[in-house]
Amino acid sequence: MARSKIALIGGGQIGGVLAQLAALRELGDVVLFDIVEGLPQGKTLDIAEAAPVDGFDVSLKGTNTYEDIKGADVVIVTAGLPRKPGMSRDDLIAVNSKIMTTVAEGIKQYAPNAFVIVISNPLDAMVTLCQRITGFPHNRVVGQAGVLDSARFAAFIAWELGVSVKDVTAVTLGGHGDDMVPLVRYTSVCGVPVMELLEQKYGAAKAAEVMAAMVKRTRGAGGEVVALLKTGSAFYSPASSAIAMAESFLKDQKRVLPTCAFLKGEFGVDGLYVGVPVVIGAGGAERVLQLKLNAEEQAMMDKSVKAVKDLVATLK
């Protein structure tokens, strides 16, 4: 049986971690592409030389030509400029749209059957642009945002309650930006609603304040990392999140992962890429799980969807 092939477009911080994680998990042979000569070659050589230590056995190749991604089963796109302190994700749209156009054309030509996961920011616009240019079915072009946003939300909750992150289930909806919707009502610890546990610890009034602070921190979590790094944006957690999506596709795991997916009426949204819970399997984004939202949650979702629509409308 032939091994799967994973193509990574963009050899920066996220791309390097993606290559390492894909190799460590032996998800398939890895091709790392970047326009900078020597960068992807150096990173893949470095990772490959760790194989005898870490015990993985896959092929790793760095390249500066799209032809080398030919026949890839999965393509993960990280290419684009990262944020700097004070920038929003949306500030990147003009320059990263040009980069995504070139990338999508390369994918269309050399990996026409791939499942494409976009990480590049502004995410909701970039995944839309990628699908438009490739012309791939919507179920084969998705964006990584919700897995990361939900993981950040879960981490903050685990730290606050002093429990294992493994026991926290958190859900976020909407766009990957300041208007994302962390769903408190659907968030739990071993099945126990998170607000019950916070109220046991703090009382109702204080619990509400603590949760509001965690929701705010989740929405600004990417910016928090940017402000601390000063020279770039997060790369470990986005890479881990995208690898979870790729693995679910390659192994047909049917995992339910918050994903930037194309909606066709779900959540009252039609014809737009928005973050929602999605079953990811061998068919790509196989189906959307519809959640019943209360009035407050729906209002937040509507606001987030409007922000995504406004952003996508700026695409040339």
Swiss-Prot record:
Catalyzes the reversible oxidation of malate to oxaloacetate. Keywords: NAD, Oxidoreductase, Tricarboxylic acid cycle. NAD(+) binds at G10, G11, G12, Q13, I14, G15, D34, N96, I119, S120, N121. The active site is at H176 (proton acceptor). It holds the Pfam family Ldh_1_C. It comes from Anaeromyxobacter dehalogenans (strain 2CP-C). It catalyses: (S)-malate + NAD(+) = oxaloacetate + NADH + H(+). This is Malate dehydrogenase 2. InterPro entries: L-lactate/malate_DH, Lactate/malate_DH_C, Lactate/malate_DH_N, Lactate_DH/Glyco_Ohase_4_C, Malate_DH_type3, NAD(P)-bd_dom_sf. One of its GO terms (molecular function) is L-malate dehydrogenase (NAD+) activity. Its EC number is 1.1.1.37. It is an enzyme of class 1 (oxidoreductase). GO terms for biological process: lactate metabolic process; tricarboxylic acid cycle. It comes from the Bacteria. Belongs to the LDH/MDH superfamily. MDH type 3 family. Substrate binds at R83, R89, N121, R152.
